[in-house]
């Protein structure tokens, strides 16, 4: 087929493959806080496998390491707890409310 007859074909873009977050030399361990902290959200939650871009086996090891670190008090269970602030409340109306019929 001639190229002029295919008006809607897009050229394929090249893309750069991302580096894996865990290198081959990295050891997933509860004491390796610099590695573990990359897989925790700001609230202290364990990030999902899709977000982390790791394999299933690596995600399992990360989860176990994070849980062990939490139990041994190396990591907090929760971080950035919301501070409840009292906001200015609106004053109540003192008049009786009547229903219109």
Curated annotation (Swiss-Prot):
<dbReference type="InterPro" id="IPR018275">
    <property type="entry name" value="Ribosomal_bS18_CS"/>
</dbReference>
<protein>
    <recommendedName>
        <fullName>Small ribosomal subunit protein bS18c</fullName>
    </recommendedName>
</protein>
<dbReference type="GO" id="GO:0006412">
    <property type="term" value="P:translation"/>
</dbReference>
<keyword id="KW-0687">Ribonucleoprotein</keyword>
<dbReference type="GO" id="GO:0070181">
    <property type="term" value="F:small ribosomal subunit rRNA binding"/>
</dbReference>
<dbReference type="InterPro" id="IPR001648">
    <property type="entry name" value="Ribosomal_bS18"/>
</dbReference>
<dbReference type="GO" id="GO:0005763">
    <property type="term" value="C:mitochondrial small ribosomal subunit"/>
</dbReference>
<dbReference type="Pfam" id="PF01084">
    <property type="entry name" value="Ribosomal_S18"/>
</dbReference>
<keyword id="KW-0694">RNA-binding</keyword>
<dbReference type="InterPro" id="IPR036870">
    <property type="entry name" value="Ribosomal_bS18_sf"/>
</dbReference>
<feature type="compositionally biased region" description="Basic residues">
    <location>
        <begin position="1"/>
        <end position="19"/>
    </location>
</feature>
<keyword id="KW-0699">rRNA-binding</keyword>
<keyword id="KW-0689">Ribosomal protein</keyword>
<feature type="region of interest" description="Disordered">
    <location>
        <begin position="1"/>
        <end position="23"/>
    </location>
</feature>
<keyword id="KW-0934">Plastid</keyword>
<dbReference type="GO" id="GO:0009507">
    <property type="term" value="C:chloroplast"/>
</dbReference>
<comment type="similarity">
    <text>Belongs to the bacterial ribosomal protein bS18 family.</text>
</comment>
<dbReference type="GO" id="GO:0003735">
    <property type="term" value="F:structural constituent of ribosome"/>
</dbReference>
<comment type="subunit">
    <text>Part of the 30S ribosomal subunit.</text>
</comment>
<keyword id="KW-0150">Chloroplast</keyword>
């Amino acid at each position: 087929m001639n190229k002029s007859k295919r008006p809607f074909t897009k050229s394929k873009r090249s893309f750069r493959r991302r580096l894996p977050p865990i290198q081959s030399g990295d050891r997933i361990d509860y004491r390796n806080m610099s590695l573990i902290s990359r897989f925790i959200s700001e609230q202290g939650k364990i990030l999902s496998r899709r977000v982390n871009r790791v394999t299933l086996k690596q995600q399992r090891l990360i989860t176990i390491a994070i849980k062990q670190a939490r139990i041994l008090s190396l990591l907090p269970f929760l971080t950035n707890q919301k501070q409840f602030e009292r906001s200015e409340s609106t004053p109540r109306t003192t008049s009786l409310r009547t229903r219109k019929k």
